[in-house]
């Protein structure tokens, strides 16, 4: 239902909603916006968004100058706000600086709840290394470009996963993101793969819980979803290939399911001309 009205916002909070004009006498620094011919609606919340990866191509992620990709992320943040999204939960990527710039009023954008670097196993959905890169601990050359910029981090074993989770929390993550299943945009895994041992996932869960927060996981298939739930994960991302028993488990354990449904016509990876 729509109607004509007036809204008073004080310090980013809605104070008054009225069908009649709202007196502003005595309120300093009032800005009046004429909404004639327009609609005012509550701000939308996107529970799964990538400020950085939604606007940068895979080639950008692997090769582009970091400053260039961050400028694109800032532009996308403003566009997201203008689409009506005032709060987003960022599901992975280097957005700590972007969040700070928005919070300090340097850039326009939604409130961001950041996850930080995607945490992936070797050969997992967040492993963007070239085929000639040796796996750790045999790699002689340190972090890859995507790891240095904070897009993803490779962690194998309980200790490495714990460090990766704690480091994201140190940088300001409001939740931790693990890649516990395969995907369609990664180089070395299949969609149906199960990733990370239960003990590794639980290590991230413990680190998150000690910081008063939780773990969200990228995952599609029942086996991988069930493993994540048994490890203590609170939020399942995607889960498109879920079955009935796994859905019942989600309900019993009161797990959040954030599905991001899409169709073949959504064109998730448009060409430059299409963009």
Residue ranges and their predicted role:
Residues 69-79, 156-169, 220-224:
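Short, acidic/polar
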Residues 2-41:
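Histidine-rich, glycine-flanked metal-binding segment
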Residues 7, 12, 37, 45-48, ...:
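Divalent metal-coordination and catalytic microenvironments
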Residues 92-94, 150-166, 229, 234-244:
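Active-site glycine- and acidic-residue-rich loops that bind
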Residues 38-104, 122-131, 199, 231:
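Metal-associated gating/positioning segment near the N- to mid-region
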Residues 58-71, 129, 139-163, 214-216:
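Active-site mouth loops of central-metabolism enzymes
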Residues 65-66, 115, 122, 178-275:
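Active-site core of metal-dependent hydrolases
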């Amino acid at each position: 239902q729509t109607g004509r009205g007036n809204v008073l916002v004080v310090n980013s909070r809605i104070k008054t909603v009225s069908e009649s004009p709202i007196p502003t006498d005595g309120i300093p620094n009032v800005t009046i916006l004429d909404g004639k011919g327009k609609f005012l609606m509550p701000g939308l919340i996107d529970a799964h968004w990538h400020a950085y990866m939604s606007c940068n191509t895979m080639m950008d992620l692997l090769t582009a100058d970091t400053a260039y990709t961050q400028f694109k992320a800032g532009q996308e943040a403003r566009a997201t706000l203008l689409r009506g999204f005032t709060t987003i939960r960022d599901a992975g990527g280097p957005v700590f600086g972007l969040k700070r710039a928005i919070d300090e009023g340097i850039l326009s954008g939604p409130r961001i709840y950041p996850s930080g670097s995607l945490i992936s196993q070797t050969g997992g959905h967040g492993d963007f290394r070239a085929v000639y890169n040796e796996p750790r601990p045999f790699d002689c050359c340190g972090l890859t470009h995507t790891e240095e910029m904070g897009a993803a981090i490779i962690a194998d074993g309980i200790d490495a996963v714990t460090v990766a989770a704690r480091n994201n929390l140190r940088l300001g993550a409001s939740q931790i993101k693990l890649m516990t299943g395969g995907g369609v945009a990664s180089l070395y895994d299949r969609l149906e793969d199960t990733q990370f041992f239960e003990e590794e996932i639980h290590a991230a869960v413990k680190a998150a819980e000690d910081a008063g927060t939780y773990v969200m996981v990228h995952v599609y298939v029942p086996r991988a979803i069930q493993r994540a739930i048994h490890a203590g994960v609170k939020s399942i991302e995607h889960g498109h290939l879920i079955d009935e028993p796994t859905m019942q488990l989600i309900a019993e354990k009161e797990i959040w399911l954030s599905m991001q449904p899409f169709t073949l016509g959504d064109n998730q990876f448009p060409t430059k001309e299409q963009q």
